[in-house]
Amino acid sequence: MYLSKFTDYNFRILIYLGNHPNEIFTVDELSSILGLSTNHIKKVIYKLAKNNYIYSSKGRNGGVKLIMNPKDINLEALLEITEDNLNIVEYFSSDIISCNLNGECKLKPALNDALNSFKLKLSEYTLADII
């Protein structure tokens, strides 16, 4: 399984903000500290603010800070809002009905079980557990 850079960046930003509660950081500061482009940071901030994980304000005195309690930020829930596609293989897509092995393939259910186990395990953790 491969998680997108976008998901990675969301986790990194939340971990950093979680380790610095009540501090406000600009996009440029986060970019410099985390080694990420400002464009990527802006996209992540938009998504996190839209889902009420962080406070974000623009302007001269603007910046971002964590507003949710780290104990209330479930990692699986975060994964669900950041990953557009958790399909392990192409034919998990709703556009593709089945494997070409015509009923002989039992891979899809096995991989689906593995994905569900991954998500279930991740749901046991919060941001507080990883900061």
Feature-to-residue mapping (PLM):
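Basic amphipathic alpha-helical segments that dock to polyanions
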Residues: 44-49
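Non-DNA-binding regulatory cores of transcription-related proteins
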Residues: 67-131
